[in-house]
UniProtKB/Swiss-Prot annotation:
Catalytic activity: alpha,alpha-trehalose + H2O = alpha-D-glucose + beta-D-glucose
Recorded family membership: Belongs to the glycosyl hydrolase 37 family.
InterPro entries: 6-hairpin_glycosidase_sf, 6hp_glycosidase-like_sf, Glyco_hydro_37, Glyco_hydro_37_CS
Positions annotated as active site in the UniProt record: 380, 580
Free-text tissue specificity from the UniProt record: Highly expressed in flowers. Expressed at low levels in leaves and stems. Expressed in guard cells.
Subunit description: Forms homodimers.
Residues involved in alpha,alpha-trehalose binding: 224, 232, 268, 277, 279, 344, 346, 580, 595
Gene Ontology CC: one annotated term: cytoplasm
EC code: 3.2.1.28
Protein name, per record: Trehalase
Effect of gene knockout: No visible phenotype under normal growth conditions, but plants accumulate high levels of trehalose and starch. Elevated trehalose contents and drought-susceptible phenotype.
MF terms in GO: alpha,alpha-trehalase activity
Keyword Membrane applies: yes
Length: 626
């Protein structure tokens, strides 16, 4: 009989007994089913051995769970960004709460010559060590920043647009009201204030800046946003088309295409700390808008390979999700998914405070990824991304398959099909027409809710890495402006019966307010919720309704556009500026909420005002005053 030695040298058991013990289905069976010939003392020894073994295993597994990390993709940032985060932390700790500076103003600093990063880091180490873990005095910190850094925005220089004319020929000829016309000229003139170029020092010494080099001049949004932003640029270009500034518009597209060429996708914004995420994919729509006016085939030919590159980014890897419908058909859709699982450099203190309630590294990393992903959506922040709104810590953006993202990608498929046809590639065009039809089918199956008359975001049951079966209860039945985004697509707004349902739903939704369309019905304190309204959503819904052949839809579109124009006018007359967002529950009030102060300028707001005035004009008899 073959025997095996165990931990107790005095214990011998047969092969049969050994197998019976160690193939037992439960460790408790093992502990309490000792062979009868084993003495009591030996049974006790074995019991304590297995007891301590189980305790050790449990403790080890708990420690492992505390040290588990998020395995998703992370794009590394630069040494300068990492260092500026330290400066930002020190600054926000030094200032009194009521005087807290904008954290982004520190991450946008550039190194002053002749100092190197290592020299400044060494000086900063000395500065903070002298404070003995106490806040650095504000005066001392300000002196340090002034000595070693050039101010935020100093590496972005004013640029006079070559194609700006103060009163272009035929400009807004259908705006008959002279008061409105004069205001429209002032809005048109704001392009000069927002036109900039990246300084030569950024091209020559990129490692001294967080601003990225770009080949052409830019139109920035304004205020704290001292760089070009991806999805903002679409509505800026809509306005530039009205202003007949075609060279400037092409320059914006050229800049974004250069980012796609370098990174494989258009960045959230042209900063080193934005390389970990994109924004709503509207590059193809920008190219289409410009071609539609200029018939520039060379621009189309240059754009196609880069649009294919961007299309691949949004339809592969973590961005890609597959939803199987009741008939077993797999729908390939997309979600936002930032390549980052740490605090956002531009708001790192805010993000760290928000994550402070989580106990494990894995929870914090997932939360940070969901925050960065909300930023990739452009709608940062909103209850739309929260599992338990308005609890900010329940942010779960990567679990949402958003209606509007897939609208943008459907538009991209249609745009690429059109451009390939223009360039003579009929086979390529046919492929993208087929892709667009497949995605449009998903709008009917995955997003559409017949009872609501809206398209609803879909919440994933799992991580999204495997296909999952569609469930009705996974649709988010809360009302958001984005639920109506598909009406922007011509193949959808041409369906009269569908449009009538959507018009009824929008009318009864509670979203239509005195100054435009609410972003949501929830007043959460977040800026992409009630009572705010935003230019992009106004334009998409108004344009979609206006293109329909349904009379009620056209009338609704014009009514919303006039409300939006009027409120922007009243805010401008009151404050002297155009704002990033409006409080649409009242006429003539700008919006607030979120993690920064209200911003002015403002790129996409200007663009939508001009586009609406071009489309709808303003009769001489119609007053624009409150």
């Amino acid at each position: 009989m073959k025997s095996y030695k165990l931990n107790n040298p005095n214990l011998l058991i047969s092969t049969h007994t050994h197998n019976k013990l160690f193939l037992s289905s439960s460790p408790f069976n093992l502990l309490f089913s000792f062979p009868s010939f084993i003495y009591l003392k030996q049974q006790r020894s074995l019991f304590f051995f297995f007891f301590f073994f189980l305790c050790f295993s449990f403790t080890t597994s708990m420690l492992d769970s505390d040290t588990d990390t998020d395995s998703g993709p992370v794009v590394a940032t630069t040494k300068l960004v990492t260092f500026l985060q330290r400066v930002q932390h020190t600054a926000l700790r030094s200032y009194p709460k009521k005087q807290t500076p904008d954290p982004k103003s520190y991450i946008d600093l550039s190194l002053k010559r002749p100092y190197s990063l290592s020299t400044i880091e060494s000086a900063f180490d000395d500065l903070t060590s002298e404070s003995h873990d106490q806040p650095v005095p504000v005066e001392t910190l300000e002196k340090f920043v002034k000595e070693y850094f050039d101010g935020a925005g100093e590496d972005l220089l004013h640029h006079e647009p070559v194609d700006f004319v103060s009163d272009p020929s035929g400009f807004l000829s259908n705006v008959e009201n002279e008061e409105v016309r004069e205001w429209a000229r002032e809005v048109h003139g704001l392009w000069r204030n927002l036109s900039c170029r990246v300084s030569d020092s950024v091209r020559e010494s990129a490692d001294r800046h967080t601003l990225l080099p770009l080949p052409e001049p830019v139109i920035i949004p304004g205020s704290r946003f001292r760089e070009v932003y991806y999805w903002d640029s679409y509505w800026v270009i809509k306005g530039l088309m009205t202003s007949q500034m075609f060279t400037t518009a092409k320059g914006l597209v050229t800049n974004l295409m250069s980012l796609v060429e370098t990174y494989g996708y258009a960045l959230n914004g042209a900063r080193a700390y934005y390389t970990n995420r994109s924004q709503p994919p509207l590059l193809s729509s920008m190219v289409y808008e410009i071609y539609n006016v200029t018939k520039d085939e060379e621009l189309v030919r240059k754009a196609i390979p880069l649009l294919l590159k961007e299309y691949e980014f949004w339809n592969s890897g973590k961005h890609k999700v597959v939803i199987r419908d009741a008939n077993g058909y797999d729908h390939v859709l997309s979600r936002y998914y930032a390549m980052w699982n740490k605090p956002r450099p531009e708001s790192s203190v805010f993000d760290e405070e928000s994550a402070s309630g989580f106990s494990t590294m894995l929870e914090k990393q997932r939360f940070h990824r969901d925050i960065a992903t909300a930023a990739e959506s452009g709608c940062d922040f909103s209850t739309r991304w929260m599992r338990d709104p308005p609890n900010f810590t329940t942010m779960a953006t990567t679990s949402v398959v958003p209606v509007d993202l897939n609208v943008f990608l459907l538009k991209m498929e249609l745009d690429i099909a059109f451009m390939m046809k223009v360039s003579g590639d009929q086979n390529g065009s046919d492929r993208f027409v087929k892709a667009s039809k497949a995605r449009e089918k998903a709008f009917q199956t995955v997003f559409w809710n017949e009872k609501a008359g809206q398209w609803l975001d879909y919440w994933l049951s799992s991580s999204g890495e495997e296909s999952e079966t569609w469930k009705a209860e996974n649709q988010n039945t809360n009302v958001f402006a984005s639920n109506f985004a598909p009406i922007w697509i011509n193949s959808i707004n041409s369906d009269e019966n569908l449009v009538k349902k959507v018009v009824t739903a929008l009318k009864n939704s509670g979203l239509i307010a005195p100054a435009g369309i609410l972003t949501s019905l929830t007043n959460s304190g977040q800026q992409w919720d009630s009572p705010n309204g935003w230019a992009p959503q106004q334009e998409m819904i108004v344009t979609g309704l206006g293109r329909s052949s349904v009379k009620e839809a056209k009338e609704m579109a014009e009514d919303i556009a006039r409300r939006w124009i009027k409120s922007n006018y009243l805010v401008y007359k009151k404050s002297g500026t155009i704002h990033e967002k409006l409080k649409v529950t009242e006429l003539g009030e700008y919006g607030g909420g979120g993690e920064y102060m209200p911003q002015t300028g403002f790129g996409w707001s200007n663009g939508v005002i001009l586009a609406f005035l071009e489309e709808y004009g303003w009769p001489s008899h119609l007053s624009i005053e409150a």
